[in-house]
Amino acid sequence: MIRKSNSLLKILFSSICLISGSAMAAPTTDLSKQIVSEKPGSILSIAQQDVTDLFLHADQRLLVNYRSRGVNDEPIVASAFILLPKGTPPKNGWPILAWAHGTTGVADTCAPSGDYAGGPVHSYQEVASKALNGWLARGYAVVAPDYQGLGTLGAHPYMNAKSQLHTVVDAVRALHMLKPKDFNQQWLVMGHSQGGAAAITVAAYGQKDAPELDLKGAIALAPGGYQYEGIAEYVLSHPNPEPSVAAFFPIVLLGAQAAEPSIIPENLVSPEMGNVLTQARSRCLSELQSDLKKSPSSIFRPNADLKPLLSYLKQQSIENMVPTVPLMIVQGTKDHLVDPRGTYAYYQQLCKLKKPTIYQTIDGGDHRDALRQSHTFATHFLNVIEKNQTKSYCSNFK
């Protein structure tokens, strides 16, 4: 239930009004005039959301629009939901978990902050909420960005490393804008699938991007994006892939176009695949997978020039990311969406570079099992960080 009167929310509204000089309305996408002069993380609007049964350990849930930075560092509006734990903040403030969600789609209806029972991302949110409840029970405040272009103006540059870095880091900054004394400078990032790649990018560049904050570590659950160009190469060599791949691939194409407009998916795909591409502009991944019963007979046009697409995708690959903070990777051995061999190859790469990395496998685990079982692994990771033992995990790696 929404609480009609809440002292903390009143304080938050008052604080934000003092920062912005204007009253806060419910989040809206028509904020372009405000964003140019605002600093990254500045809150542009705030509204209270229902604390549903999904988040039993949350005292409040807030929806914010905040100033962030896009693919080319341009000012953008991004949205996120915030979960505050029960009880009063500790003396040094609540530590923060930034949650980077997995692939939902590129349409605005795919933004997790707008989730509702029976909605296109609700089944995923049900799984994610169990993991986030564990962090709330630990006394962490949670901020969950939607990423650029999900629920806000503009297209979603799916899997663009720079954009995902910015929206995650600036969401943490936005949380500190609410009431700085209530939040600790220490924070962690955890992400799944698409968000796993985002968490790895934050692990590589988060300290440099936000030196005023204290990033302690990152957790990547079944992270996508190893040799990211491989998805296009796979489709090229398998012109009639299984429907799940055919439903997912338009998200890759539209995400690439959002970041690099010279990539025009309609010029690359077959007319039959073009119909799926059109659906992907307004439908979420779960809907696309449900709708597509049979793959198109071909994906690409004959002689399509894929070099710009492959070059762009390769630039977003996680093997380009070298973490500067401890990283834990969790991967199911029966994951059919993220190849465990690629995830392990990335771990090998980091160990050869002598980066503090923990690799946890889930025997027989599928793509979502890394998220379902993240609570146990997170507890272990926190203990390792607290004892400063992460360096030992790759010390015997050959």
List the predicted regions and their residue ranges:
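Alpha/beta-hydrolase active-site loop
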Residues: 158-179
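Gly/Ala-rich beta-loop-alpha elbow adjacent to hydrolase catalytic centers
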Residues: 191-195, 199
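C-terminal catalytic histidine-bearing segment of alpha/beta-hydrolase fold enzymes
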Residues: 301, 305-311, 337, 341-398
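Gly/Ser-rich "nucleophile elbow"/oxyanion-hole loop immediately N-terminal to the catalytic nucleophile
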Residues: 84-93, 173-192, 210-214
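Short beta-strand element of the alpha/beta-hydrolase
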Residues: 92-104, 114
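Short beta-strand/loop motif that positions the catalytic acidic residue
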Residues: 323, 328-331, 335
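Catalytic-loop region of hydrolases
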Residues: 25-92, 351
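Accessory cap/linker subdomain of secreted extracellular hydrolases
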Residues: 221-320
